[in-house]
């Protein structure tokens, strides 16, 4: 399954790539943003992704744009170091497409989805020290409930944590299917918001495993450091926690020589949501360095 980048047209329009410019695609994934940027102008893209699986998509895209595309397998909190490692000091723009990719969700062995039972992993970087199995089978009940509430917004977080603790006392929880069943037993299904009861808890665990909010904060700070005057940072987020980090960081940057490109987040059109249901929760925020 190929990942469809959300708000692609809006991102490229706001970025407005120019010939001779240098851009960073901080979340390469399937290469959708990078491809469109490279098609739009005779520029160079430095791509970053912590998932080694993306090398396949990078190699394919490189054939179309030899000498103009580079990849570093790294976290975007290391963005500044990556840019410097390529011999570049400042760039003209940085784009972020947050969250999981369609490829990650489709691969049951990665553990990101409960649609098909797979390993309790959820690591975006295969060398990361902690995974979902560690969270589910070792984290104390109170900490577990707090994570599920804070990162997932799950109002029944205490019930979910209690159900997981009770289940792991009987035997180790080893796969996403079993975990989803345990969560569903603790969360009443809502008639008003008919999402799967496991959705919020899976999101919370994924954020914990990958330290996503701290990574995002560090990535935005690094992007601001490497940006030229006139350069832009664009971020597409998919849940309120991510969006809050972006909004607050952009607000603080406005006191440091930056200006918002759009005061309100840009949302996907009805047509895009119809063609790509994943886009429905997408929000694009953009900021430019003006001094």
Curated annotation (Swiss-Prot):
**Record's keyword terms, sorted:** Cytoplasm, Methyltransferase, rRNA processing, S-adenosyl-L-methionine, Transferase
GO CC, alphabetical: cytoplasm
What does the entry list as the binding residues for S-adenosyl-L-methionine? 31-33, 49, 76, 97, 104
Name the cystine pairs: none
Q: Name one GO molecular function term.
A: rRNA (cytosine-N4-)-methyltransferase activity
Q: Which domain of life is it from?
A: Bacteria
Looking at the keywords, is Methyltransferase present? Answer: yes
Write out the annotated subcellular location. Answer: Cytoplasm
Q: Which Gene3D superfamilies match?
A: Putative methyltransferase TM0872, insert domain, Vaccinia Virus protein VP39
Q: Which reaction equations make up its catalytic activity? A: cytidine(1402) in 16S rRNA + S-adenosyl-L-methionine = N(4)-methylcytidine(1402) in 16S rRNA + S-adenosyl-L-homocysteine + H(+)
The family database entries (Pfam families) matched by this protein are listed as: Methyltransf_5 (PF01795)
Query: What's the EC number here?
Result: 2.1.1.199
Q: What is its main location?
A: cytoplasm
GO biological process: one example: rRNA base methylation
Main role?
Specifically methylates the N4 position of cytidine in position 1402 (C1402) of 16S rRNA.
Q: Which family does it belong to?
A: Belongs to the methyltransferase superfamily. RsmH family.
HAMAP family xrefs = 16SrRNA_methyltr_H (MF_01007)
- What is the name attached to this protein's record? Ribosomal RNA small subunit methyltransferase H
């Amino acid at each position: 399954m190929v990942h469809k980048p959300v708000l692609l047209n809006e991102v490229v329009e706001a970025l407005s790539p120019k010939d001779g410019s240098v851009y960073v695609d901080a979340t390469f994934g399937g290469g959708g943003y990078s491809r469109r940027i490279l098609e739009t102008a005779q520029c160079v893209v430095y791509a970053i992704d912590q998932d080694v699986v993306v090398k396949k998509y990078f190699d394919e895209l490189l054939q179309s744009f030899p000498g103009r595309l580079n990849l570093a397998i790294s976290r975007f909190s290391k963005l500044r170091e990556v840019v410097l490692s390529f011999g570049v000091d400042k760039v003209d723009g940085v784009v972020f497409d947050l969250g999981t990719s369609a490829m990650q969700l489709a691969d049951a062995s990665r553990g990101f989805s409960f649609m098909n039972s797979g390993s309790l992993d959820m690591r975006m970087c295969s060398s990361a020290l902690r995974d979902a199995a560690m969270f589910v089978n070792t984290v104390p009940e109170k900490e577990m409930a707090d994570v599920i509430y804070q990162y997932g917004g799950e109002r029944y977080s205490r019930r979910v944590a209690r159900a997981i603790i009770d289940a792991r006392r009987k035997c180790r929880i080893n796969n996403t299917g079993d975990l989803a069943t345990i969560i569903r037993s603790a969360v009443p299904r809502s008639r008003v918001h008919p999402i799967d009861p496991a959705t919020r808890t899976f999101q919370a665990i994924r954020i914990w495993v990958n330290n996503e909010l701290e990574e995002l904060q560090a990535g935005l700070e690094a992007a601001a450091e490497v940006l030229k005057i006139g350069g832009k940072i664009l971020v597409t987020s998919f849940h309120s926690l991510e969006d809050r980090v972006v909004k607050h960081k952009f607000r603080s940057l406005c006191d440091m020589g930056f200006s918002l490109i759009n005061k309100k987040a840009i949302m996907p059109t009805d047509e895009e949501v119809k063609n790509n249901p994943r886009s429905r929760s997408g929000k694009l925020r953009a900021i430019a360095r003006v001094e």
